[in-house]
């Protein structure tokens, strides 16, 4: 990594081009990755699918968007993010187009799985931007790039209008498909165009921190426990984000009886802070330190989910005089939305804080470490919805969705805090067994 101020200033325009174009590309990839959440309704109607069959389409896309993040990050470090990201854009365009031509449920499953490859672009962008930005700017840069998560809402906003406006027969004699099939076709075209823009719009001389290093050598950092601890943090702030983005519309409909379009809009009040506040989290991590921001993150999530997991009923209070007071507890949609918004705020700043740790501890291995952390975090988005469903089925309480989140956040917080205490003891050995105040020193 370059530390010469003159060289850093000279490369500033190149850094910014990498940042903004990679962010735009990632937003598009994220939109294509999660497009089946909105397309599910017309797909189910056309193919006569059950809820379980439909759920597998999105699940396979999410799964494949997780599996290759480690490898993608390593390849970006070794061959440069410009090449790897461009190839991923072109590759993802192929199954996106094939989705628009799918004629059976089995074909949809296969093509959705392949489209899911788009989710792995996150690791490429993280490694790429880390290679270009100096340490004191990495938190903000990675936060800006990660804000491409807002692509999760793109199809929610443009999808229904486009599906309704494009004729079912399409255009040019069906060459451009109509109805729901127009959306994956449009994404396929945009992905190809974005591939050319990224290739010709970013510096030809790329940064390759892993060039020439043996592949196994790039995997060595994965033996450190802190890598797996960071992964658990990311399950909380990203895996749960992906899971709740898919789960909340159903929750609003089932628990509060809202129509689907209102449920989708209220879900966006969770998605936007969880995505767009990522640059803020990066800036705060640069200024105050990533660990302190993680304390804030877990505090917000624990507080909000702790209230949300409370079932409706009565709270019984006893005074000192023995009097009994009974208070009815109900969760209105306004309070629920506010608390979910707060969880989104915590996740938004927390995602950037997790990734701020990585170039600090592993400056030469951001691709491998960031890839593993991203992979396990995204796998959380695959496994958490079934956990939500089982918790609700076992208890009969929809609020148990947030008990799962509370438990996961509590475990992560406890692990982090015990690690911090251990670090403090190592830095101040003399206080380990002698921590009482001496004389008149103030506390």
Swiss-Prot record:
Cellular component GO terms held in the UniProt record: plasma membrane
Keywords (A to Z) from UniProt: Antiport, Cell membrane, Membrane, Nitrate assimilation, Transmembrane, Transmembrane helix, Transport
GO MF entries: antiporter activity; nitrate transmembrane transporter activity
Record-linked Gene3D superfamilies: MFS general substrate transporter like domains
Effect of deleting the gene: Mutation has minor effects on the ability to grow anaerobically. In contrast, narK1/narK2 double mutant is unable to grow anaerobically.
Signal peptide (UniProt feature, chain positions): none
Reaction catalyzed: nitrate(in) + nitrite(out) = nitrate(out) + nitrite(in)
GO terms of biological process kind: nitrate assimilation
Pfam family, one: MFS_1
Superkingdom of this protein's organism: Bacteria
Keyword Transport annotated: yes
Mode of membrane association: Multi-pass membrane protein
Membrane spanning stretches: 23-43, 56-76, 79-99, 108-128, 142-164, 182-202, 230-250, 255-275, 298-318, 329-349, 368-388, 401-421
Subcellular location: Cell membrane
SUPFAM superfamilies hit by this protein: MFS general substrate transporter
Purpose: Probable nitrate/nitrite antiporter that may be involved in nitrate import and nitrite export during anaerobic growth.
Family to which this protein belongs: Belongs to the major facilitator superfamily. Nitrate/nitrite porter (TC 2.A.1.8) family.
Name of this chain's protein: Probable nitrate/nitrite antiporter NarK1
Organism: Thermus thermophilus
Name of encoding gene: narK1
